[in-house]
Amino acid sequence: MKLDTHVHLLISKTARPDWDEIRFTLDAARRNGLDALCICEHLDAVHYADLLEGVFDANRVGGERLAPGVLRLESGLLLSSGAEVSLRGGGDAGVHAPPDVLRRLERQKGFYSLPELLDVLKAGGGETAVVAHHVYFGRKWIDELPVVGKQLSAIELPAKDLASREKYELLAARLELPLVGGGDGHTWLQIGACHTEIGEAEWPDASVFSIARLKDALKRYRAEPVAVAGADRLVRMSRIYRQRLEQAAA
């Protein structure tokens, strides 16, 4: 199983879903060998709700609904619903959860601290996973991470900060958490630039996905972050392409 645990399908927080571009992005991800994408769009994006509804309810991308928040496209690519939550005090957490759980979250940026977010998800019931995103990139450190970090499912190694890999590895070891790879791409170029691989023995059927199965693989330390050759270049190219898309949409 090859999956990118951190994927955006909107080019910016103010952009509307461009369904033609989204379909192209998903097709490119599959052609690049990915089996699954965890859609962690910014929860505070203006059109987050439109994207969530369009992908997982209205099925604008043409897939088979396997479970709430899980689609299998005709190409075989799996999509799982999620959100990137910007925390109070700085930093971001990836929440992997069904759409009904995501819709109950307060969308305002900085509304939750990490402990509050974890408490809300726990109280809401259902299967969820929370991943600390790009904590060593810029000012993305999460202040409460040393205190509640062990309650998370994983630490992310992001494609845009591969030079800090050793820091992420040490943090994951200190918190006794697995390390996952996330592309954090807003365009098709960056998706999968860093991704997560789980062996066939642990995940024998790459045509199915569930948060419970992902969490189980993470708990067993069966996930491995993998950066593709030229990942840094893909990140730079994606940044340029994204700027062009934003200019065209203005």
Label each residue range with its predicted role.
Residues G33, G126, V148-Q151:
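Short loop/turn motifs at secondary-structure junctions
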Residues A36-C38, V131, G181:
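Structural recognition of the beta-strand scaffold that forms the well-ordered cores
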Residues H42, H133-Y136:
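Short, well-ordered beta-to-alpha junction loops that form the rim of enzyme active sites
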Residues G82, H133, G182-G183:
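Generic beta-sheet signal
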Residues A123-A132:
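Short beta-strand/loop segments at the ligand-binding rim of alpha/beta enzyme cores
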Residues M1-L118, L157-L175, L189-Q190:
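A metal-dependent hydrolase metal-coordination microenvironment
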Residues M1-T5, L9-A15, D50, L87-L102, ...:
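Charged catalytic cores and adjacent phosphate/nucleic-acid-binding surfaces used
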